[in-house]
Each structure stands twice: as C-alpha cells, then as structure tokens.
From Swiss-Prot:
This is UDP-N-acetylenolpyruvoylglucosamine reductase. GO terms for biological process: cell division; cell wall organization; peptidoglycan biosynthetic process; regulation of cell shape. The lineage of its organism: Bacteria, Pseudomonadati, Pseudomonadota, Alphaproteobacteria, Sphingomonadales. It comes from Erythrobacter litoralis (strain HTCC2594). Coiled coil: none annotated. It catalyses: UDP-N-acetyl-alpha-D-muramate + NADP(+) = UDP-N-acetyl-3-O-(1-carboxyvinyl)-alpha-D-glucosamine + NADPH + H(+).
Length: 323
C-alpha cells in the first residue's frame, strides 16, 4: 500500500493523467500538485466496511474539504470509475477489490446545523444518529427514523434509505453533489426520481451535503421516539455482528425476512457466512467469511426463496468490485 502526499512529488498540472510515478511504476490517477487530501494506492477496504471482508481499492482518496474534492474530480480521467464510501454498511466489497477510485469523506463533511425554519443542513459524512440527535436537541421532529439506520447522509440520499415507515425522500429538500468532472450542483428532491431504495443520481456523483425538512417538536418526546427506534432495532436485528444491514428489498406486499424464513434459510451457512438466526434478512460474517461466501450465500437464499414461493428477491445491499 502506498500513500501519496502532495508534497512528496514535484510535478506540473498538465491536465493529463497520469503524470506522477509511484513506487513500482504505479501511476497516480491525477496530477496531485495542489491536492491536499490523502491518496492511497491499493488501500485495503475490509476494515472500512461492516462485513469486514473484501479486497482493496485501486485508489482511495480522502479529500481535505469540498474544494479539494472538486479539484480532484476535475483532474481525474473521466474513464475511471468513482465510488463514494460512507459508513460501510449496506455494502459488499468483492474480494478482487474495487477498480478506479473510492472516495471517503471525512470530518470536513460531517457537520450538522439546525435552522429556525426547522430545517437541518448536514454533511454527507454525518451519521444518521448524529443528525437525529442534533435535530432532537433543537426541537426538530420528523428525523427520528434516521436513528435506526446505520449509515451516513450521503448513503441515505443515494439509496433513499428508510426505516420504521419513513424514507429519506419524505424529509429531503435538496442535496449538493459534485459530479464527475468536478462541477458542483444542487439537486432538488424531485430530480432524484426516488423509488424504493433507489435514486437517479448518476454514477460517479458524490453527495457532499443535504438539507432536510423537519417540524416543531418537544425534545423529550423526540428523544423517547428515538429510544423506541433504538430499542426496536436492538431487539430485532443482529446489530452487534459483522453484517451489512437488510440484505434484500421487501417485495410489494411482502416481507423479505418472512420469505427467507419460509424457504428454510434461517441459520443457513456458506463458508464463514450465515443467515442470521435473529433476523433472516441479515447475512453475517461469523467466521472469517470472504465476500464470495457472503454474496454466494445471498444468491443461494434467492434461489431457495424462488423455488419455494416463486418470488424473486432483489438485493438491497450494494455489491461492488471484482470477484
């Protein structure tokens, strides 16, 4: 693994990539002069995702701030794939690693601010728990459900994350996005064309912040609802395991976990992966599972559910990278 800091290289920005040589003739994906973030070649990703499995990113970029991110994407070869990585839930990183560039947003993108009109402005790197708690302290209701979703606002916006009867589209006003090429745009919620666990955000777009609409509320009542959400999650889900969250989308009028259970998959194993005994719509890494174990188990569950009920389950967990 090689970490490049901009001061390590004397080079000129010609607008073409690559121009820098890194150890072993590995070329940096952009001219790095003036880039202030951290750029790492062959960066292990397993430690950054909840399943604790998977390969490395060809490149991992951790921008110093918004301007740094815009500069980086403006210089990046448009043919290279770009993926934003949040908290690492809802994600399988395949064992062969991720091509192109993975972008990890840090503290500069994790702020949360409340406003007198009961709106909340939050960075894409802010955790759902922080957003809900900050809103509670300001007497802003309507965001309690985010307490029960593992992830960051950037991921919530991209996939229309939801829980306990509420979804991101119910509270999102708009979001700020850096597009491939480095342009900065604000997209109103209508432009995202939300459906169940899906948005129309273009590939390679990086959400950097979002504005959410709440409503007046009593902090004590809001706090009690957040505690209820947290307790419900603790009681029903394997939250203290290496898991990725809900594995399959709920088919219309049905619950995925019931279909999985009816097909006899509770406790089913493949390699070091297992269908949770506690909640059958969760896969868990119980014994050094590879990502191939986890994804393979999910595919086997899909096969058995279809054979039993005729319903074809759809993955909710994102699966990225090379096998």
């Amino acid at each position: 693994m090689n970490t490049i800091q901009p001061d390590d290289w004397a080079m000129h920005d010609t607008g073409a990539a690559p121009t820098a040589e890194v150890e072993g003739a590995v070329a940096a994906p952009v001219p790095i002069e003036g880039i202030r973030g951290k750029l790492t070649n062959q960066a292990p990703l397993a430690k950054l995702v909840w399943f604790k499995s998977g390969g490395a990113a060809d490149w991992l970029f951790e921008p110093a701030d918004l301007d740094d991110l815009k500069t980086f994407l403006a210089r990046l070869d448009g043919d290279l794939p770009v993926m934003a990585l949040g908290l690492g839930s809802n994600l399988i990183i395949r064992d062969g690693g991720v091509p192109g560039v993975v972008i990890k947003l840090g503290k500069a993108f994790a702020s949360v601010e409340t406003h007198d009109d009961y709106t909340v402005t939050c960075g894409a790197g802010a955790h759902g728990v922080l957003v809900a708690s900050t809103a509670r302290d300001a007497g802003i209701a309507g965001l309690e459900f985010m307490r029960g979703i593992p992830g960051t606002i950037g991921g919530f916006v991209r996939m229309n994350a939801g829980a306990y009867g509420r979804e991101t589209r119910d509270v999102l006003i708009d979001c700020d996005v850096v597009l491939p090429g480095g342009s900065f745009v604000t997209l109103p919620v209508a432009d995202l064309q939300y459906t169940y666990r899906h948005s129309a955000l273009p590939d390679g777009a990086v959400v950097v912040s979002a504005r959410l609409q709440g409503e007046p509320g009593d902090p004590e009542i809001i706090g009690a609802e957040m505690e209820r959400v947290a307790e419900a999650r603790e009681q029903s889900q394997p939250v203290r395991t290496k898991t990725g969250g809900s594995t399959f989308k709920n088919p219309p009028g049905k619950k995925a976990w019931e279909l999985v259970d009816a097909a006899g998959c509770r406790g089913l194993t493949m390699g070091g992966a297992q269908v949770s005994e506690k909640h059958t719509n969760f896969l868990i890494n119980v014994d050094g599972a590879t990502s191939a174990d986890i994804e393979g188990l999910g595919e086997e569950v899909k096969r058995r559910v279809y054979a039993h009920s005729g319903v074809e389950l759809e993955w909710e967990i994102q699966r990225v990278g090379r096998p």
